[in-house]
Amino acid sequence: MFLSLLAITPASVSWTPKVALVMIICNVIAIAIGKATIKYPNEGAKMPSASFFGGMSHGAMLGCTSFGHLLGMGAILGLSTRGVF
């Protein structure tokens, strides 16, 4: 049974600067989407440097970066499947 699970596990990509750049770009895109679509981005606990984070609260930034990591994971797996990495 364990061997059949190994057969369906996708090959992971080693961490390189190209992979990091894709993750950073996906997080920036997610923050831009969140900034444009979150109704109350400044509700809740404030970030330490509000001007650096665009006035977004801790919860909004956490949600945006979580979404960015989901986008990045999909982009990295998709690009590695296509043979880019």
Swiss-Prot record:
SUPFAM superfamilies: Photosystem I reaction center subunit X, PsaK
Annotated Pfam families: PSI_PSAK (PF01241)
Main location group: membrane
Source species of the chain: Synechococcus sp. (strain WH7803)
Keyword annotations of the record: Membrane, Photosynthesis, Photosystem I, Thylakoid, Transmembrane, Transmembrane helix
Residues that span the membrane, as ranges: 13-33, 59-79
Keyword Disulfide bond (UniProt): no
Membrane topology classification: Multi-pass membrane protein
Annotated localization: Cellular thylakoid membrane
Family: Belongs to the PsaG/PsaK family.
InterPro entries noted in UniProt: PSI_centre_PsaK_sf, PSI_PsaG/PsaK, PSI_PsaK, PSI_PsaK_bact
Gene Ontology biological process terms in this record: photosynthesis
Name under which the protein is recorded: Photosystem I reaction center subunit PsaK
A Gene Ontology term for the protein's cellular component: photosystem I
